[in-house]
Amino acid sequence: MTTIVAVQGDGYTVLCTDSRIATIDDSGSSNPVTTLGYGMSKIAQNGPYLLGAAGDVRAINILHHVFTPPTPPSNLKGKKLDAFITAKFIPALRECFEKQGYGSSEPGKAPAEQNSLIILSIHSTIYVIDGDYSWASDAQGFYAIGSGSNYALGALHVLAPKRKPVVSTAKTIAIKALSAAAKYDSGTGAPYHTFVQEQPAKKPRNTTKNQQTRKRVK
């Protein structure tokens, strides 16, 4: 159980995740809810990407510790970046998942499907990849996935300024959106980790203050 929110700005992206996990049994009941340990997050930098997932912890493990994503040319953006994600990134992701034995075992689902929603940022552009490996981007630049996504997405739209927010504003509303989700969704909870990806590229920087982690990546 997870909530991840993201904001697409002009030349930057902000991704923010909670730290709560739970096991769901066959009846749909949630078993003991726990919090990820120190140094762990549902989002991580992998090469030039920020990668996160809502669904199975196994998907997060593979994304962060096994998957070697293909690197797009540094100047790739727009439709050419879309094509790269479609033709290069997603096939590599699917191959990695299948090699690791991760996929859908639910009756009626195609073998190609898996059980998590994946969110990524590359070149300060956000993509959300569904269980069937299709991807989408939001025209307004606001994203939320996971068990508390409805609460978080509503909060993002209410809190967002009329114009595209600057990075500091985007980080603030992302944290507030997660806090709103945590109030109404038992599967969402602190500490919250915030990641920033900006263009032009800057050297990675990771600072921790209280419950927030900030990363700047190429």
Which residues fall in each region the model found?
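Conserved short S/T/G-enriched processing/targeting/catalytic segments and their helical context
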Residues: 1-105, 110, 136-172, 184-205
